[in-house]
C-alpha cells in the first residue's frame, strides 16, 4: 500500500478540505484534525500540520499539494547528476543552467518537499523550495546575463551551442567538487549528434558519459532539482534587471514583452534592451517598429 507524508501550507490544506469536504469522516485519534475517506485512499491531517496519504490512490491526491511521483526509470536509483536550463524561451532575462547531484537516500526528502518539473510548479512554490534545495543538494548554477548572451550569440555561439557550453561547464564544475555520479542526464534540447558537434569546441571536458533524454525533469529527481533551482535563478535575475530599469519585465516572448520592450527602447535606447533582453528575438524588431 502506498504511503506518502507531506507538510503543505495551511492554505493548501484548507483548499483540499473544501474540494473534498463530502469525504470527511470521524476519527478517534486525538492527534488527527481531519480524516477523509476517498476512493482508493485515506487522508489523515494531523494537528502538527503533517498529512499522511495511504492507499492505491495516494499519489493522485498528493498531487493536489504539488507532489509528483518520479518513475523508477533506468538510473533513477543511482547517484546521478541532472541538468536543466531556464530562460531560453524568454526575451527578457538571462539564461540559467544548473547541474545537481542527487543520491538515492535523498529521494524521500525531495518527494516530501514536492519537487517536480518546474513547469508544473507555480513561481511562488519555486521561490519557496529553491533555497532549501540550494542548501541541501550539491549543485552548480550558472547564469549568462542578457548583455553577455548578446555578446557571444552570433560571434562564437548560436542559441543551441551556447546551451551546450553552459550545460557542459555546469557539469564540469560540479565534478570538480568531487561528486561521483554513476549517470549524467541532460534534459534534451538538441540531438546527441548536435550536442557532440558543439561540445568539440569547448575546452573543459570530462570522461563521464552523458545521456540526453526528453522530458527528463519528469523522470529524474536530479533533473527536477536543477529545473527548480534554475527557474528560481532566472526569476531572481528578471526581477533585478527590471528593478534597475524601473520596469516589471515579463517572462516569455509574447505581446506583453513587445509592449515593455518598446517602452524600454524609448526610455533607454538599444543600450537598455541589450542590458535586459536577448536581442536576436523577434521582439526587438517589433519594438523598433512600434
From Swiss-Prot:
PROSITE patterns: RNASE_H_2 (PS51975). It is an enzyme of class 3 (hydrolase). GO terms for cellular component: cytoplasm; ribonuclease H2 complex. It is found in: Cytoplasm. Residues 78-290 form the RNase H type-2 domain. Its EC number is 3.1.26.4. The keyword Nuclease applies. Keywords: Cytoplasm, Endonuclease, Hydrolase, Magnesium, Metal-binding, Nuclease. Pfam families: DUF3378, RNase_HII. Manganese or magnesium. Binds 1 divalent metal ion per monomer in the absence of substrate. May bind a second metal ion after substrate binding. Transmembrane segments: none annotated. It catalyses: Endonucleolytic cleavage to 5'-phosphomonoester. One of its GO terms (biological process) is DNA replication, removal of RNA primer. A divalent metal cation binds at residues 84-85, 187. Its cofactor is Mn(2+); Mg(2+). One of its GO terms (molecular function) is RNA-DNA hybrid ribonuclease activity. SUPFAM superfamilies: Ribonuclease H-like. NCBIfam families: rnhC. Endonuclease that specifically degrades the RNA of RNA-DNA hybrids. HAMAP family: RNase_HIII. Belongs to the RNase HII family. RnhC subfamily. This is Ribonuclease HIII.
Amino acid at each position: 500500500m502506498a504511503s506518502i507524508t507531506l507538510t503543505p501550507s495551511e492554505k493548501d490544506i484548507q483548499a483540499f478540505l473544501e474540494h473534498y469536504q463530502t469525504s470527511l469522516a470521524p476519527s478517534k485519534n486525538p492527534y488527527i484534525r481531519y480524516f477523509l475517506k476517498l476512493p482508493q485512499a485515506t487522508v489523515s491531517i494531523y494537528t502538527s500540520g503533517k498529512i499522511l496519504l495511504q492507499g492505491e490512490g495516494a499519489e493522485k491526491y498528493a498531487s493536489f499539494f504539488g507532489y509528483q511521483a518520479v518513475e523508477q526509470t533506468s538510473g533513477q536509483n543511482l547517484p546521478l547528476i541532472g541538468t536543466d536550463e531556464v530562460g531560453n524561451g524568454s526575451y527578457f532575462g538571462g539564461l540559467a543552467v544548473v547541474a545537481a547531484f542527487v543520491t538515492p537516500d535523498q529521494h524521500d526528502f525531495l518527494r516530501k518537499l514536492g519537487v517536480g518539473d518546474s513547469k508544473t510548479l507555480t513561481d511562488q512554490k519555486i521561490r519557496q523550495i529553491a533555497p532549501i534545495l540550494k542548501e541541501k543538494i550539491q549543485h552548480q548554477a550558472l547564469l549568462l546575463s542578457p548583455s553577455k548572451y548578446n555578446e557571444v550569440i552570433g560571434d562564437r555561439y548560436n542559441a543551441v551551442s551556447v546551451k551546450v557550453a553552459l550545460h557542459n561547464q555546469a557539469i564540469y564544475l560540479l565534478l570538480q567538487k568531487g561528486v561521483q555520479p554513476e549517470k549524467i542526464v541532460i534534459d534534451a534540447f538538441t540531438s546527441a549528434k548536435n550536442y557532440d558537434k558543439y561540445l568539440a569546441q569547448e575546452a573543459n571536458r570530462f570522461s563521464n558519459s552523458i545521456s540526453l533524454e526528453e522530458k527528463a525533469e519528469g523522470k529524474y529527481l536530479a533533473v527536477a532539482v536543477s529545473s527548480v533551482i534554475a527557474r528560481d535563478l532566472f526569476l531572481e535575475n528578471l526581477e533585478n534587471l527590471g528593478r534597475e530599469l524601473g520596469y516589471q519585465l515579463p517572462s516569455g516572448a509574447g505581446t506583453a514583452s513587445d509592449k515593455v520592450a518598446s517602452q524600454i527602447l524609448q526610455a533607454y535606447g538599444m543600450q537598455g534592451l541589450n542590458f535586459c533582453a536577448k536581442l536576436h528575438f523577434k521582439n526587438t524588431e517589433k519594438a523598433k517598429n512600434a
